C-alpha cells in the first residue's frame, strides 16, 4: 500500500501521525500474532522495519504554494527549514520508500504557466530544495531519491516531451553539478 498526501502547512504533524499509526498497527499485529507485547528490542526493530517499509508521498511543496496558489501560511524560509527537517528526519531514520516532497508544477500551470515555464519553475524549485538540504549538511544521495515531481498535462505539443526533458535536465545536473549517484539522478514524476 502506498499513501499519498497533498498537504502543505500541516505536513510535519500529519506525517508524524501517519508514521506513528503505521508503527502502532505493526505493534498491534505483533501482539495479536504472539499473544504478548513486544520487548523493548523487538519494539525498536518493529519501528525500524516499519519506517523502512512504509510507502507514500507528501506533496508539501511550499514553493508552488507561493508561485501557483499564493496561499502560504509560513514564510518561504521557515517552510524550507521545516521541509529540510522532514528530509533530515527521513535520512536519520532510514525512510527510503516515502517521498518527502513532491515538487509540483501542476499548480504553477493551473496559475497560467505554459508547459515550458511550468517545467522551468518546477525544476528550479527542485534545485532550490536540493541546495537548501545541502546547505544543512545532508549528502545528495541521502535525500535526492526521496524527491518526486508532479506535472500537468495538456494538448500543447510540449506536453508530449515534458517528462523526458525534465528527466534529462535533472540527471545531467545531479551527476555533473552535485556528483549524485545513479539512483539520485532519476527524476520520478506523475502527470495529471
Feature-to-residue mapping (PLM):
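Catalytic alpha/beta active-site cores
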Residues: 1-153, 158-162, 177-192
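Conserved, mostly hydrophobic/aromatic
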Residues: 170
Amino acid at each position: 500500500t502506498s499513501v499519498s498526501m497533498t498537504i502543505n502547512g500541516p505536513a510535519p504533524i500529519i506525517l508524524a501521525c501517519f508514521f506513528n499509526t503505521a508503527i502502532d498497527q505493526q505493534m498491534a499485529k505483533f501482539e495479536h500474532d504472539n499473544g504478548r507485547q513486544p520487548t523493548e528490542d523487538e519494539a525498536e526493530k518493529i519501528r525500524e522495519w516499519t519506517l523502512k517499509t512504509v510507502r507514500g508521498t507528501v506533496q508539501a511543496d511550499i514553493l508552488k504554494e507561493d508561485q501557483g496558489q499564493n496561499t502560504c501560511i509560513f514564510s518561504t524560509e521557515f517552510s524550507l527549514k521545516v521541509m529540510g527537517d522532514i528530509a533530515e528526519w527521513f535520512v536519520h531514520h532510514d525512510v527510503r520508500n516515502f517521498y518527502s516532497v513532491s515538487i509540483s508544477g501542476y499548480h504553477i500551470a493551473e496559475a497560467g504557466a505554459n508547459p515550458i515555464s511550468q517545467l522551468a519553475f518546477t525544476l528550479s524549485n527542485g534545485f532550490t530544495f536540493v541546495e537548501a538540504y545541502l546547505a544543512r549538511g545532508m549528502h545528495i544521495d541521502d535525500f535526492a531519491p526521496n524527491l518526486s515531481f508532479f506535472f500537468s498535462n495538456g494538448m500543447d505539443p510540449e506536453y508530449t516531451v515534458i517528462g523526458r526533458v525534465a528527466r534529462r535536465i535533472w540527471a545531467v545536473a545531479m551527476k555533473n553539478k552535485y556528483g549524485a549517484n545513479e539512483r539520485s539522478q532519476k527524476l520520478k514524476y506523475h502527470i495529471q
